[in-house]
Swiss-Prot record:
Keyword Transcription carried by entry: no
Record pathway: Amino-acid biosynthesis; L-histidine biosynthesis; L-histidine from 5-phospho-alpha-D-ribose 1-diphosphate: step 4/9
Top-level taxon of origin: Bacteria
InterPro entries named in the record: Aldolase_TIM, His_biosynth, HisA_bact_arch, Isoase_HisA-like, Isoase_HisA-like_bact, RibuloseP-bd_barrel
HAMAP family: HisA (MF_01014)
Pfam families: His_biosynth
UniProt key word Metal-binding: no
Organism name: Albidiferax ferrireducens (strain ATCC BAA-621 / DSM 15236 / T118)
EC number(s) given by UniProt: 5.3.1.16
Name of the coding gene: hisA
Enzyme class: isomerase
The protein, known as: 1-(5-phosphoribosyl)-5-[(5-phosphoribosylamino)methylideneamino] imidazole-4-carboxamide isomerase
An MF annotation (GO) of this entry: 1-(5-phosphoribosyl)-5-[(5-phosphoribosylamino)methylideneamino]imidazole-4-carboxamide isomerase activity
Length: 246
């Protein structure tokens, strides 16, 4: 079970948002590469970066901070990045800089042809991030709710050749209210590619619950506010996950 620390980037700083609201952000570090090094030193095997400004702007906005992280830890751990990635040139530029996985969200929903092209050109490096509320997909930094069903869309993207799906329950993200285990398992059971859980991780009980259903196809979990607020000790959680599943 991969426990994947999240580093959300806003104006070059590491922050956390509450339910995706840019006006409700808490700054945890003005030097994101220092935070990245911290999680790697504590045993992280993968990092999850989000260019928050980029997600809203539709193009990269925190590339300098991202490149500093890749330069410092990119040779030690896999790094995945989402937010504002809407064209093949951006994907190629980030992969050349040492990124392992590119996360495509809104662009995958709005422009499936782009996702197909990305999977063809960069097979093995494309993850789709599906953000949902009550089973329906949200786009544009969660500001727009669509009528797309998350399971139906995930199955379509699986056929395109994406590496995995990150499933975020946006009603829980940043709220420390607990992972939506049932919805995550339901999605994983419908697919043959792995699912990474996200949104609402609140403590060790969530880690143990996810480990119990890992064999349903759940590869890991994004660790956000809980590891920054102290509600979850990352090192202890990784150790517990290793004990349960390895």
């Amino acid at each position: 079970m991969l426990l994947i620390p999240a580093i959300d980037l806003k104006d070059g700083h590491c922050v956390r948002l509450k339910q995706g609201d840019m006006d409700q952000s808490t700054t945890f570090s003005e030097e994101p590469f220092v935070m990245a090094r911290n999680w790697v030193d504590k045993g992280a095997r993968r990092l999850h970066l989000v260019d928050l400004n980029g997600a809203f702007a539709g193009h990269p906005k925190n590339e300098l901070a991202i490149r500093k992280i890749l330069k410092d830890v990119g040779s030690e751990v896999d790094v995945q990045l989402g937010g504002g990635i809407r064209d093949l040139d951006t994907i190629e530029r980030y992969l050349d800089a040492g990124l392992r996985y590119v996360i495509i969200g809104t662009a995958a929903v709005k422009n499936p042809g782009f996702l197909q092209d990305a999977c063809t050109a960069f097979g093995g490096h494309i993850i789709v991030g599906l953000d949902a509320r009550d089973g329906k997909i949200a786009t544009d930094g969660w500001s727009k709710l669509t009528r797309h069903d998350v399971v139906d869309l995930a199955k379509k993207f699986e056929d395109y050749g994406v590496e995995s799906i990150i499933y975020t329950d946006i009603s829980r993200d940043g709220m420390l209210s607990g992972i939506n285990i049932e919805a995550t398992v339901r999605l994983a059971q419908a697919l043959t590619i792995p699912v990474i859980a996200s949104g609402g991780l609140s403590g060790m009980a969530d880690i143990e619950a996810l480990c119990a259903v890992e064999n349903e196809g759940i590869e890991g979990v994004i660790c956000g506010r809980a590891i920054y607020s102290g509600d979850l000790d990352f090192e202890a959680a990784q150790e517990r996950a290793n004990e349960l599943n390895g």
